[in-house]
């Protein structure tokens, strides 16, 4: 059920980027952008989703546990030192390991796609300010 809700939300965000001119702004006869930003947003979402799914195993958060001599091992060591010898349940390292070990690539991909979309909107708003 949660996956359907997230998927519907992402579809809504994609359709929202396709909406024309915002209220109160004049429509330009010629635009430097050939479209509504849909393809650019889709590119950011695809890259974000792909990096999120491939990123956790690349950092060392694998299904078999945290890989030795990896970024994940360093994060686990730092977390244990800062917390008096143990990694806290529900902390960043534990959450990332849970996502990496669970193989929840759909949820991770959706989160990455959402982050890609947020990056697209942020960069798009900065271009509008200039």
From Swiss-Prot:
GO terms for molecular function: molecular adaptor activity. Interferon-stimulated protein that plays an important role in innate immune response against a wide variety of viruses. Inhibits flavivirus replication by preventing the formation of virus-induced endoplasmic reticulum membrane invaginations, which are double-membrane vesicles that flaviviruses use for their replication. Plays a role in apoptosis, negatively regulating the intrinsinc apoptotic signaling pathway and TNFSF10-induced apoptosis. However, it has also been shown to have a pro-apoptotic activity. Modulates innate immune response mediated by RIGI by preventing its activation. Belongs to the IFI6/IFI27 family. Keywords: Antiviral defense, Apoptosis, Immunity, Innate immunity, Membrane, Mitochondrion, Mitochondrion inner membrane, Transmembrane, Transmembrane helix. Glycosylated. Its main location: mitochondrion. The keyword Transferase does not apply. One of its GO terms (biological process) is cellular response to virus. One of its GO terms (cellular component) is mitochondrion. This is Interferon alpha-inducible protein 6. It is found in: Mitochondrion inner membrane. It is a multi-pass membrane protein. InterPro entries: IFI6/IFI27-like (IPR009311), IFI6/IFI27-like_sf (IPR038213). The chain crosses the membrane at residues 4-24, 41-61, 75-95, 99-119. It comes from Pan troglodytes (Chimpanzee). It comes from the Eukaryota. Interacts with CIB1; the interaction is direct. Interacts with the chaperone BIP/HSPA5. Interacts with RIGI.
